[in-house]
Amino acid sequence: MKLHLSALALGTTLLVGCASSGTDQQGRSDPLEGFNRTMYNFNFNVLDPYIVRPVAVAWRDYVPQPARNGLSNFTGNLEEPAVMVNYFLQGDPYQGMVHFTRFFLNTILGMGGFIDVAGMANPKLQRTEPHRFGSTLGHYGVGYGPYVQLPFYGSFTLRDDGGDMADGLYPVLSWLTWPMSVGKWTLEGIETRAQLLDSDGLLRQSSDPYIMVREAYFQRHDFIANGGELKPQENPNAQAIQDDLKDIDSE
């Protein structure tokens, strides 16, 4: 189960620092909010406390940290060729070559990617949030499409989650069988949940956890699509306010 809880860590910070201009921003929409809230309640109030969280606690407490790091490095290394292609598609050949170098060094010298040799050798080759095909679409202004909460999966939009399926067309991801892909997805989901166990209070303290999760999801993907930059939101009434101020000054 992939609940996209990693959005909370970055998204909560962004929500504090950025104003939001509504769910229609950058193609955001939530036409199925009633259904989504029902699925959210199932995912986060039934599935998470009784299945996902206990597994994540056991993973954190009993799996050695070096083993967790190695598995995370390995699954991340599988995505490096697709990330490289997406940077080229976004017109950023420098970052594309950075990820080519990461894949080459970590695969050859890092035991197939279990050791992040590249990141240890050069700070400029540190592992970063992967740019998937959904991020490329966002880079060119493609809207998210309807937001949906899926059972056992969590937050989903056609652009970022559906678009990411295109990454599976590139090696090494294209070489994975269906069971291998499920195993990768499961490992990533458990590791993400384990990393956020200490942040559970964020949701419990929120007046509307569903809105918090939804907006954190959008903020996180906006941040990635914008190349790690926070773009100020334009006030739709800014021009009218400026005109009023000019009228006052002219009097």
Predicted features along the sequence, with ranges:
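Positively charged n-region of N-terminal signal peptides that target proteins for export
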Residues: 1-5
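Bacterial Sec signal peptide processing site at the extreme N-terminus
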Residues: 14-35
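Post-signal-peptide N-terminal segment of Sec-exported extracytoplasmic proteins
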Residues: 31-65
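A structured, mid-to-C-terminal "fold-capping" secondary-structure block
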Residues: 131, 135-251
